[in-house]
Amino acid sequence: MSTKTGNYISIAIFAFFGGIARAWLNSSFGFYGTFWGNIIGCFLLAFFTYLFMEFKDVRQWLTVGLGTGFVGAFTTFSTFNLDVLKNIQANVPITALIYFLSSIIFGFCFAYLGMNAGKQVGNLLRKED
């Protein structure tokens, strides 16, 4: 099997699980499920990216599977935008603005935390080798 084919299969498998996790969040927490899914996704993508940067021999199928597959299916930019528009149309523009700004601010903060956590875990794992 070619590397390209393996990457596509990995993305599909990980996306399946990311989609299930997101569906569970949305069914369990509704509107807040989308918010927290996106925030957690910001953390996870940064975490995996910086963790894998600490190692030279990480398989590409794993990096694209977790990043593009799992996190890509777990997060949703389109639903985020739709939720903002729904709040505007429901004449609650303050709620829309708070949701929009908190998503951007918390997303950035959690990505920053994920970056630092990924670097630290990577350093710890390298020291154990």
From Swiss-Prot:
The keyword Chaperone does not apply. Signal peptide: none annotated. Na(+) is not transported, but it plays an essential structural role and its presence is essential for fluoride channel function. Keywords: Cell membrane, Ion channel, Ion transport, Membrane, Metal-binding, Sodium, Transmembrane, Transmembrane helix, Transport. It catalyses: fluoride(in) = fluoride(out). GO terms for cellular component: plasma membrane. It is a multi-pass membrane protein. Heterodimer composed of FluC1 and FluC2. Neither FluC1 nor FluC2 alone catalyzes fluoride efflux from liposomes. Belongs to the fluoride channel Fluc/FEX (TC 1.A.43) family. Fluoride-specific ion channel. Important for reducing fluoride concentration in the cell, thus reducing its toxicity. This is Fluoride-specific ion channel FluC 1. It comes from Lactobacillus acidophilus (strain ATCC 700396 / NCK56 / N2 / NCFM). The lineage of its organism: Bacteria, Bacillati, Bacillota, Bacilli, Lactobacillales.
